[in-house]
Amino acid sequence: MLLVIDVGNTNTVLGVFDGEELVHDWRIRTVIENTVDEYGMLMYNLYKTSKISSKAIQHIIISCVVPPMLNILEPVCEKYFQVKPLIVGPGIKTGMPIFYDNPKEVGADRIVNAVAVFEKYKREAIVVDFGTATTFDYVSPRGEYMGGCIAPGIVISSEALFTRASKLPRVEFSTPKLIIAKDTVSSMQAGIIYGYAGLVDGIVARMKEEIGSNPLVIATGGLAKVVKPETRSIEMIDDMLTLEGLRLIYKRNS
């Protein structure tokens, strides 16, 4: 079995593939203060509850945008699984040309998403990934990574509102019925959800104008399901796009 690990700034997503089939996946918090043994035991217990033996994990690949986490997860893989993980980074085979001024600057998760979307859908696409930051990445009809843009994520944008405006409460991410709201909580929810949907639609529209075509627009990431219904541009959600991309990249390097 193949263990894929996608380390984001806020959450870490793990998945186990048996061949091409994703048989289990989990989402845990990214905590750089945790020790090797704390992460090792957490992962061990996740597998145990899913009735997966640690000995069944024969291969591991990691995509990480939080460099200190590699100092934790690499030893975890070697100590608890006796496997040296493959790390997505410079020099790894992606099978995708990267048209970026400095390819080393591109976040591993962005490349992984691009690889997955082209392999899976076989067409040009814009991938919108709702994470700590929200990324917009364009893949050409020839399967080339052409770049994109990065916006503040919906969570950190909202945190700025809660922390900088002392009289405004924290609110849950849910969509109010009306944009012209009648109370403070609903007003904030309207601003956050509809405002962010407008940000997404605006950026996608400008990207399409610059590209001069009409690519598939696909969303992934933890909050995609909250924002997508309020957008006009996102056509579909693929929750497991990043995990699938990691599987593909591992295959191309094995």
UniProtKB/Swiss-Prot annotation:
It comes from Syntrophus aciditrophicus (strain SB). ATP binds at residues 6-13, 132. This is Type III pantothenate kinase. SUPFAM superfamilies: Actin-like ATPase domain (SSF53067). Keywords: ATP-binding, Coenzyme A biosynthesis, Cytoplasm, Kinase, Metal-binding, Nucleotide-binding, Potassium, Transferase. The gene is coaX. Its EC number is 2.7.1.33. K(+) binds at residue 129. InterPro entries: ATPase_NBD, Type_III_PanK. GO terms for molecular function: ATP binding; metal ion binding; pantothenate kinase activity.
